[in-house]
């Protein structure tokens, strides 16, 4: 996404030169160079990432109650060519490990603990994220009897909507939401929209790399951060236009 913005600015430079709009051309060139340096050096992605993750930097001390649910949000699947088997993506393993860790902490409290794996077949691979992630959870010691699959959602909004529908059939008084640090703020917003009071727990923390020379890594993490910011913008726009599902009061789900 950042490269698309820079490419568009480069096209505008060409257009302004064609029409000999020298002042406009100079301004756009300055903007183009400035953005390239600020993104590549890590200054812009550092700001964007801090804005998304700062409130979730410290993981909460969960107070386990009698009926607990730990929600694991999917982040895609990957086909391994040599085995023709599907595994969680690179970005998923942190979420899975954090979920298993939270489950073990919950189990130590000798209370009811369920893991809800939310993720359908968004990539049309013929297998759902919930199925694939469940296998990893089993390997990490989470009992099959304590895993509930929500296998129809294809994005974060549907994760929240369909999981809240599922919750109406259970009596959980404590809900822990696990996702990536970059993604947890928007996830919490969506789950709150559907009436779920959740305790957000980040599985990882993404940071920019400050450098005197532009790094491709910083452009990549900028794109991740911009994707989240666009999600907030879309949510606010849809609310304004009345296109989102009706917001539920916390605890209604």
PLM feature spans:
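A structural signal for short, hydrophobic/glycine-enriched beta-strand patches
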Residues: 42-219
């Amino acid at each position: 996404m950042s490269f698309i913005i820079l490419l568009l600015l480069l096209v505008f430079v060409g257009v302004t030169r064609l029409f000999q709009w020298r002042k406009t051309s100079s301004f756009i060139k300055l903007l183009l160079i400035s953005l390239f340096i600020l993104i590549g050096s890590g200054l812009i992605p550092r700001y964007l990432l801090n804005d998304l993750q700062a409130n979730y930097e410290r993981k909460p001390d969960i107070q386990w109650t009698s009926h607990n649910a730990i929600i694991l949000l999917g982040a895609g699947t990957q086909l391994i060519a040599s085995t023709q088997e599907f595994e969680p993506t690179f970005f998923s393993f942190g979420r899975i490990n954090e979920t298993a860790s939270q489950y073990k902490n919950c189990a130590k409290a000798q209370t009811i603990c369920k893991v809800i794996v939310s993720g359908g077949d968004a990539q049309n691979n013929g297998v759902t994220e919930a199925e694939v992630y469940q296998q990893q959870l089993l390997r990490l010691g989470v009992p099959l009897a304590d895993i509930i699959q929500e296998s129809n959602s294809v994005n974060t909004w549907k994760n929240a909507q369909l999981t809240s529908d599922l919750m109406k059939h259970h009596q959980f008084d404590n809900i822990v939401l696990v996702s990536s640090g970059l993604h947890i703020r928007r996830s919490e917003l969506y789950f709150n929209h559907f009436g779920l009071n959740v305790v957000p727990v980040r599985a990882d923390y993404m940071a920019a790399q400050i450098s005197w020379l532009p790094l491709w890594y910083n452009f990549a993490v900028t794109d991740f951060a911009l994707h989240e910011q666009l999600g907030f913008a879309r949510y606010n726009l849809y609310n304004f236009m009345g296109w989102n599902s009706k917001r539920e009061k916390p605890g209604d789900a």
